[in-house]
Amino acid sequence: MTNQSTIDKLIEMRLTTMADAFRTQLDDPKFKEVPFEDRFGMLVDIEYSNRKNNRQKRLIRNAGFDQPEASIMDINYTSGRKLNKDLINRLATCEYISEHRNLFITGATGCGKTYMACAFGMEACKQYYNTRYVRMPDLLMDLDIARTEGNYRKVMAKYSNPVLLILDEWMLLKPTDTEQKDIFEILHRRRKKSSTIFCSQYVFEEWYDQLGGEASPLADAIIDRIAHDSYQINITSIDAEHDRSMREVYGLDKTLRE
């Protein structure tokens, strides 16, 4: 078998990175002195690393992050917000995902909830967890359209199956009875099987009322499915009188606006 034939077969098997590395070895006289086992190991390592990198990129792309540049390393701890750095670093290990636990990120608009949630999502993708980000209004609209078009089960699976689901703008608006049923169904399917990050302007204690309180038969059921297995990060201001939105902190300098 000729070397070109070997290269062609590698390409046919979609081992293109391995094929390119093999060409490099053939063109470099130094590799003739390297034992076969070592050369073969190098080829396998290169192909393996490339596939893992491509998988990670695909997971990040498919997650649909609102802020794909978000990073745990870039979280600003000097911006006047109360942040538990130890808890954030512990959650960044993604151990909560392997334990099937949830995370509540709450705080006023502009405090950095979405950025932090996307940063946790990026860490999940780096550890090859299937992740999906969605705004709650978009999720409910998606399910409503699916109900009309007859593909409700497929869309429900889209949000039930990810190992990590990030629900942004959670309880921003009070859901209708039908929307509550959709929320209950998703959370019921995910409980003890996967993890969910909830981002909300309302603190956890206010979610029950946003769900309709005693007037809603599903409010208790929904809260019960998420309350007992969740970490909480409540982002508050150190000095309320000088509180600034993170959008303002990182926005266009006032001197350049006019």
Show which residues each predicted segment covers.
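N-terminal pre-Walker A segment at the start of P-loop NTPase domains
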Residues: 70-94
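Conserved hydrophobic/aromatic pocket- or pore-lining residues that grip, position, or stack substrates
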Residues: 75, 117, 135
